[in-house]
């Protein structure tokens, strides 16, 4: 016989070597949709109880980006892995549909017509816009291979959801936490609405930095400072000159020392610790500190406004610091949180004479009609004109900007609705829950959100917009006071649920259908009312999702086991959800919170259109396939910022190819195995038993990593298993047994049985990450061998049995592997010298001490095959020749390597001293001859 290759049992499978992910993935999506893979996965799980991951709703505006893709893939990995571990882990995707970005887009489309249209018409356009992008994003998320209840998502604009949101506001009212008052809040002049803390982002901004003197003409100055009031001044520093028209006081710290500094015949009061730096700023070369007094003694002195004829008293405040400025703080209660609190303590007027565009009203001398930022240079000019400007500089500092339009915001006192943080100990209870009731992943998230809530102001929940859930309240036309009642609010909320477009009911229903019969204002007795036009903060919308979703749907539960979002949500959804739940339920809405970082480019830079480094998910999908995007998510420690580049993706393509090829090899070598020929673990070849032990250990590490959300460990363990443990060792050793042994021989069936078990464990472990490929592999397992599951995600633990060897057996194999590594080293010099080309060309003698020799012999397997050599002997260590390879890693071992004697079998390539004993099979060894004769090969 001349062509022995045809007699080998080479791998045979229809599973393609080339992935062609971009073409095959859409086909797989159709398959999943056809069998309802999500339902099949759900039906197969639940034995261990329920596990709830609650989806933080992305905004229904625009296409998805890499950050949202990362987030959805992470959630998908959690849901799939938990289901495959036996939990009923459902995924209900959600969308945040209300708010400013959508309303802005609609305003741009409507132009000037928007002002003429009733609110419900504008809201209809907003709803249509949200629906459009919700459908777009749903398709894009499904393209990532994410399974979920896509046909039954939750939407914040759904009538039932809007009703639940309004009902939660009623619950807060019933608890007494909702107040309406005039306070300084973040205000965007461009968007013309109040902003919450979570809607403010900080960017570098250049502002004017000015030092201003206030006349201190109070007669009491003579007694307190021992100087003539006619020559006395108090000096402030500010970076917001536009707030000076609304100055009502100057604040000093009661415990700081304040100096009286004489310069050019005048006396200036400022913090003693800042005299030197201030004098340098002012250009004072000759000045003298004539006295110092504690700040507490300055309280009650009355300064005069620098350009208006009105008093500006000196007040005390603990927040005054000495790290910059003068230690004397310009106080405008209408434009700062701390200023406001000080104003309340001292009964100061809360001035904020601005319209919604940030323009000064006609009542403001010198600056009427100017925007606040237009007013800055005019205020400085006025100060210079009256002689009260001591110094002017520019300063670059971190300044609040609107999250939507990215423009600088201001603090402005307006009448708003708030959730009071101190009422019913809301703040204290939230802080306690953070410390005691929630697991934060990473752990630093606990401190971050704790600090945010510990120092946050009352929650401003009102917005001066149209597209959102209206604040259910009535305003008295007589006195302007508001009225609402929890029971009435709940009744209105119930009507929202029954209305086809939810809270459009508030806008479409005439006033008489809203106002309770005979309602009189409790403040003035009036009976003329109008509806509140403010809407709820969208963070209140999404923050009450625990009520609208977790408590309402049968496939979820309250509280959730996990909230998983980007780290910016410590001040966003995690934050608002916690306050909303603690305020009305008394418990947090989640048991654990996991955060991921931001996606950055390969150099660690934030993605920016101006830099030109933005990568869209669709670009990656079109080039590599969604599977590579999923592998990228799993390959990184997502808790930090995550880098992505073509180089990174190319490396992952190589890693993916190695995993795929391993699966293909496994499939190719079980093609002729039948269920009846599966070998029990107890009688399998010892090497096969050990291989299953390796895979079982890897499986345990992978499942632990899934449980701890350490997906990068899943990837690395999976990759190492395929590349190192399987391809480089076990599968390499098996080739002779699989290819050259008799087709139905016990040793070959043992190997095939091991490969089947390994393959089933492999597809189960890789499915949450490499979902497309795992399903493809699963579908290519011969039907008779494939577990009866509709989809790979429906595999149960019983479908993938796990096996371990004894600790003694494991110890023996660890010794074998250590020796195998040393044998490879010992052969290398001969390979380099050209004496041998392959390890099968060698005869190896292991000179081992008694302990090692006994361990090696006790394996009960053919070590020659394990080391992939043609001949192997074990000899006493003391017989080792002088030139034997001495191992540094394995004690009691030396290795002799020589060219294998005899000739190479033309079929199995193993050297034998006798070949061709059967004339019908010249060049074949005895083993191969027997196989050929038995099989009838000619």
UniProtKB/Swiss-Prot annotation:
Its EC number is 6.1.1.5. ATP binds at residue 609. Keywords: Aminoacyl-tRNA synthetase, ATP-binding, Cytoplasm, Ligase, Metal-binding, Nucleotide-binding, Protein biosynthesis, Zinc. Zn(2+) binds at residues 905, 908, 925, 928. Monomer. One of its GO terms (cellular component) is cytosol. GO terms for biological process: isoleucyl-tRNA aminoacylation. PROSITE patterns: AA_TRNA_LIGASE_I. Its cofactor is Zn(2+). Its main location: cytoplasm. It holds the Pfam family tRNA-synt_1. This is Isoleucine--tRNA ligase. L-isoleucyl-5'-AMP binds at residue 565. It is found in: Cytoplasm. Belongs to the class-I aminoacyl-tRNA synthetase family. IleS type 1 subfamily. One of its GO terms (molecular function) is ATP binding. CDD domains: Anticodon_Ia_Ile_BEm, IleRS_core. IleRS has two distinct active sites: one for aminoacylation and one for editing. The misactivated valine is translocated from the active site to the editing site, which sterically excludes the correctly activated isoleucine. The single editing site contains two valyl binding pockets, one specific for each substrate (Val-AMP or Val-tRNA(Ile)). InterPro entries: aa-tRNA-synth_I_CS (IPR001412), aa-tRNA-synth_Ia (IPR002300), Anticodon_Ile_BEm (IPR033708), Ile-tRNA-ligase (IPR002301), Ile-tRNA-ligase_type1 (IPR023585), Ile-tRNA_ligase (IPR050081), M/V/L/I-tRNA-synth_anticd-bd (IPR013155), Rossmann-like_a/b/a_fold (IPR014729). Catalyzes the attachment of isoleucine to tRNA(Ile). As IleRS can inadvertently accommodate and process structurally similar amino acids such as valine, to avoid such errors it has two additional distinct tRNA(Ile)-dependent editing activities. One activity is designated as 'pretransfer' editing and involves the hydrolysis of activated Val-AMP. The other activity is designated 'posttransfer' editing and involves deacylation of mischarged Val-tRNA(Ile). The lineage of its organism: Bacteria, Pseudomonadati, Thermodesulfobacteriota, Desulfovibrionia, Desulfovibrionales.
